[in-house]
Amino acid sequence: MISVVMSYYNRLKQLHYTLHTISNSQIKDVEIVIVDDFSDDGSKLDTLSKEFPHLAFNIIHMRDRQEKKTYCNPCVPYNIAFRASRGDKIIIQNPECCHMGDLLQYTQNNLTDSNYLSYHCYAATKSETDVLHTGQPMPMFTHKKSRWYNHVTDRPVAFHFACAISRKNLVELNGFDERYAIGHDYDDAELVVRIQNLGLAIEFVADPWVVHQYHRKTYDNPNNPPVAQNNRELYEYLQQNPQVRADNQESICGI
């Protein structure tokens, strides 16, 4: 089974289109694990199983687990999604990243315990996203170099806009490091470093790929100095003290 895991916050229109593209896959043995991260429209996720009856969903609401949000980094809901997942192959992605081609089939055929698949991710403008939602073909996209969030030559970051890893390796890594929970950024960069420390080959995939659908920002200044500085200092410290396994209170092994 393949598990597609997402941390969700107020991206319902984009999520719907992403699920539409996932539902076109030839692979049917798949589950969609979504952790709702205190979003305003989270209750609407509970109807997804009716809208996409051929997809298996596991919807987890953070409001059911704690009264208020005590973190600002998505590493926490992602780790919860990992623990809830059942697949032997895991696709980690943003809910607004729709599939251009059959990522599930490519993952099924090409993911091993020796590699990490990093799918190219193009950042669509609002007008491009609007056209995409009409079902028009992709050639209208500009594909400007500056608009790639992840690309083997233009921006080879290998972050989890859309990536795939085996369950065995995810357990070995113990997911994201939750020491980044109270700050912004660097959790994704640090995961890539630990993937390299584990000896996995990072393979950038140009086809199939994903499009990051445009959305308005729904938070206040994510780069405010104090929280950004906290995570930057932690990241720099961990580069001097390399490790493979995340230092989390709760193990991913429980999944």
Q: Can you annotate each of these PLM segments?
A:
Residues 90:
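Short aromatic/hydrophobic "clamp" motif used to bind/position activated sugar donors
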Residues 82-83, 100-179:
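Conserved catalytic core of nucleotide-sugar-dependent glycosyltransferases
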Residues 179-255:
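C-terminal catalytic/acceptor-binding lobe
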Residues 1-21:
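N-proximal low-complexity "stem/linker" segments adjacent to membrane-targeting elements
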Residues 20-29:
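Short, acidic, metal-binding catalytic loop of nucleotide-sugar glycosyltransferases
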Residues 29-39, 60-64:
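Short beta-strand/loop segment that forms part of the nucleotide-sugar
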Residues 36-47, 66, 94-98:
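A conserved acidic beta->alpha catalytic loop
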Residues 65-85:
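Glycine-rich, basic loop-to-helix element that forms the pyrophosphate-binding segment
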